[in-house]
Each structure stands twice: as structure tokens, then as C-alpha cells.
Amino acid sequence: MGIDFGTLSGRALLVNADTGEEVAWVDHPYKNKVIEKNLPNSKKRLKPQTALQDPADYIAVLTKAVPKVIKLAKANPEQIFGIGIDFTSCTMLPTLADGTPLCSQKKWRNNPHSWVKLWKHHAAQSEANDINKIGLKYSEEFITAYGGKYSSEWFFSKLLETVREAPKVYAAAERFIEAG
């Protein structure tokens, strides 16, 4: 079984491991799609180039698309012996130690930095610029390793944005998970 957590939907796929044949697949659109203007149930505007997701949409893929693809394929769940999962990197999620997303906690629900920052979140460009400036100034190897420029789409740009703009979220998060 393959599960692809995409930008607008999640897909579940069953493949016959003996033949490589695609047996069945299901596309499950995310309820909240890409969150770019306002958080769900909020009128507060998000800053430009924000791209967030709701981790509850990922759970819906697991609880709806996975059983549906098994049924569609007329497969016996006991015959599924492997699961591959993918996201586009960097998709970053602040969580508690047990993996609970911060945005699912009432205290953090209205703070955009507690939500999943999607790969195409470019609101951390200032942080990426600072990482690049410091990396170049000190001839850091990571600048060369990343093709001469660190991107706002990558983990540490998003993490630094959280540190600067939402230090309480940063302190409350016991983990920052890279989904990709």
C-alpha cells in the first residue's frame, strides 16, 4: 500500500507486489485544502505567502481512503505487508512528545505557527535570507551542499520563523516533525 499526502488531497494505492500491477487507488480531497488566507473558523488574516495544512486532513485520509481502497480492491487487509508513505519536503509539524499536533490543542488552535507549514510556505523568506547571509559570511558547507542558496521552503527557515514570531509555540512544541 502506498499513501501519498499531497497538497490538496491524499491518495491511497494498492499494488500487487508479485506483478507490480496497480490494483486500486482512491483520491481523498482535504477538507481544508491549503490554508492561505485564514485559519479554519477564524477571520484573522494570515500573512502573505503562508501555506498551512490541517493534520486532521491526514487522519481523514487514513480513516476514509485506506478502508475504501481495500474495499475497492476486494483485498484482504491481512495480505497487506508493507506501507509506503510520502509527503513533499519540507512539510513541518510542531507536536507534543506523543506526536499530538499543537494546532489540535485549544490553547494553540488560533496561532498559525502551531499548524503544519506546507512545503510551499514561503512566509519564512526573511529567515531563509538570514540563513543564507550567515552561511555565506562564514563559508558554511551547507550553502554549497544546497546549491548556493537555502530556501524558505526548507525546515530551518520555517523553524526560525516560529522562533521569531511565536516563541511560545516554539517552547510548547516538544518536537518539530518533518513529514517528508
Pin down the residues of each PLM region.
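Glycine-rich phosphate-binding/catalytic subdomain of phosphoryl-transfer
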Residues: L39-S42, K47-A60, K64-G180
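Gly/Thr-rich phosphate-binding beta-strand-loop-beta motif of the actin/hexokinase/Hsp70
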Residues: M1-P29, G82-T95
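Surface-exposed loop and turn segments in beta-propeller and other repeat-based domains
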Residues: N32-K33
